Amino acid sequence: MATVTVNTLEFVSALRALIPVSKQATLYSGEKERNAATIAARITPAKKLALITGNSALGAVASVRIEQAVETGEREFCLYTDDAKNITSIFKPNKQNSEEPLRLEFGDQLDNENIMIAETHKAYGNTELLIGNLTEDAEITDTLLNDLYLSVNNPEAPESPSFNVIKIAAFTTASKIYGEAATRVTGSDAGRIRHLIYGTHLHGIIALDRGMEDSEVATLVSEARNTVLETMGNQA
């Protein structure tokens, strides 16, 4: 698929404008306000969606708020990153010991748990946008992947491209978790669909209602992509 250069914030803004309010679990644009605790607090607890930030300093602040939400039962799970590159842990309430959340290390086998995991990858100063998908018995086809994949390369550094990527990483419960950016993981165990779109540089965080269908998300992403490309064409 051809590579195009797109401004991350413009893409997020275009995507946000297309999402019906009824489908938005959380809506936040962090271009001016970069307070991770505020971001974390704005995530709708009832939707049980987690925040991932690609900035380790902000992530540490947000992690405290989210961990508190897990411990108090507001949130079902949360994700942590270490250096804006890899998710190292998943915290869920520990049913055997409610005072201590259960830690699952990155790469652990998941069994009979509805957990959404996605990887953030930082390269050459820029980051990825990612659509994570926990799906019920879904066939993730190359067509769907292509529909949801938008690569942004830095033309000034073709040998060491700086990029933002929108990709889909599909996995279900009892699937092995893989950290490579291009890895596609599929499984057959049941899990309710949940979607999270986020900007790891806090250009924008959009958490979609987990009831949205894959086709709806694919359409939104495609329309937003076309909107940005059309705008770029008009400016040329």
Where are these regions (language model features)?
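DNA polymerase processivity clamps
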Residues: M1-A236
